[in-house]
Amino acid sequence: MKMIGIAFLCAGALLAQDGGEKATVPLTDPSRPAHIRVHLIQGGITVRGANIKNVVVEARERPDGESRESRPAAAAGMKRLDLPNNAGLDVVEEDNVVNIKTASWNQPSDLVITVPQRSSLQLKCLNNGDIYVENVDGEIDADDLNGKVTLKNVSGSVVAHSLNGAVHVSLDQVDPSKPMSFSTLNGDIDVTLPDTVKANVRMKTDNGEIYSDFDVKLDAGGPSSLSASGRRPDGSYHLHFDRSLHGTINGGGPEFQFTSYNGQIYIHKK
């Protein structure tokens, strides 16, 4: 196992740069795809695929921006001694799996990560940042609580979710054996798929419209179909009608789900 951690001492493949940090992480077996896992409490994640054999991680903590009004009364007339403006980057690599996190809980830290093009990603942001990915071929799982998710020119399979942000995905190629999911509570979903894609689609928005470039063959059940029924333990009989649309693209395939509560759904043909 290789571990690279950032503190006030620098070693090997780790550099401190003007309030930021940069680490070059060798993979155990560069001939195999990498698996990148990132979890940020505060900040955004950018991942770019490239023709490289290692993983390069750059972290930068955003400026504090303290105002005079935020100083304690007891500090009047005193000079503030700033703590090092670094994100506390921590990177661990084991058997081509790279786990990345920062020690910054209160101050947002933005990560820019360059990976081999054939990589799988698990990305999670909670606050004060967006997720952006481009030119990556693999399984991508992107989850942003309070920001938008953008995946550009990616291939493979995607699970993309945002609670309070838009989801924009452009796929060059899809894995024909994998299901996919695109969802948001408050935001639009905009997905571009290859024109030859085969999929069973399930689409639902409570407060929006659904638009598609594809000729979606809708199931005969119509816009509202019975999804659950039966007698409950208290003796009452329950019927539930699902408001989602079900259909197929190009004859059907793995299931693709598109779900928004407050937003439009756009399905484009590449």
Could you say what each language-model-derived stretch is?
Residues 7-16:
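Hydrophobic h-region of N-terminal signal peptides that target proteins for export
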Residues 1-7:
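Positively charged n-region of N-terminal signal peptides that target proteins for export
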Residues 62, 129, 138, 147, ...:
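Hydrophobic lipid-interacting interfaces of membrane-associated proteins
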Residues 16-126, 134-135, 141-143, 158-159, ...:
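Acidic (Asp/Glu) and glycine-rich low-complexity loops/linkers
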Residues 152-153, 178:
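Long amphipathic alpha-helical scaffold regions
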Residues 151-152, 160-163, 169-170:
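Solenoidal tandem-repeat scaffolds enriched in leucines and small polar residues
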